[in-house]
């Protein structure tokens, strides 16, 4: 198993496919199905390319199986925090212990950048993700934000570790 930053040799469509597959699997029953079904191939590729320095990949047996995005907090009131923007895996690799390794690497990389406090946002109804972050030391805050995804109003909750 290897975790590293994305480089020029990586196939951005392959990495985008991890986002797409993960969304369709993890958000089933949370985000409207017609929206999930309409996600086009490569939807995330341009964003991944734009922010290459902030994207990690996890490789197992020569294949990219997971990806994560990190940065300084995007929220002014948390300007001294690092942020884990996303962690996604191909569905076949979910629930097998890979996530804790990628999460640990995200935390390490943000610590190297000088962030001892880290936040992330999770869909309130995504119980699997919430349990994962809580098991790995993150605390649920009382901070929420509303999002509209696929025409459905959803609420995200902020988690943090200090």
Where are these regions (language model features)?
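Extreme N-terminal starter segment of soluble prokaryotic enzymes
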Residues: 1-3
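Short helix-adjacent coil turns
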Residues: 10-11, 97
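Glycine-centered flexibility sites
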Residues: 66, 82, 95-99, 137, ...
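C-terminal "cap" of GNAT-fold acetyltransferases
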Residues: 82, 116-119, 123-130, 134-136, ...
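Acetyl-CoA-dependent GNAT
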Residues: 5-9, 16, 20-92, 103-105, ...
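Conserved glycine-rich acetyl-CoA-binding loop
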Residues: 86-104, 111-113, 124-131, 135-136
């Amino acid at each position: 198993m290897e975790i590293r930053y994305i480089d020029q040799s990586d196939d951005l469509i392959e990495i985008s496919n991890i986002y797409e597959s993960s969304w369709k699997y993890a958000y089933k029953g949370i985000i409207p199905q017609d929206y999930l079904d309409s996600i086009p191939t490569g939807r995330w590729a341009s964003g991944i390319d734009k922010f290459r320095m902030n994207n990690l990949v996890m490789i197992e047996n020569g294949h990219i199986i997971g990806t994560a995005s990190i940065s300084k907090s995007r929220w002014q009131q948390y300007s001294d925090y690092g942020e884990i923007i996303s962690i996604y895996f191909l569905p076949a690799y979910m629930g097998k212990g890979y996530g804790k390794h990628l999460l640990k690497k995200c935390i390490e990389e943000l610590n190297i950048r000088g962030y001892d406090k880290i936040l992330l946002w999770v869909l309130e109804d995504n119980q699997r993700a919430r349990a994962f972050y809580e098991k790995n030391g993150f605390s649920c805050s009382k901070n929420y934000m509303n999002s509209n995804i696929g025409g459905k109003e959803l609420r995200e909750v902020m988690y943090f570790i200090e």
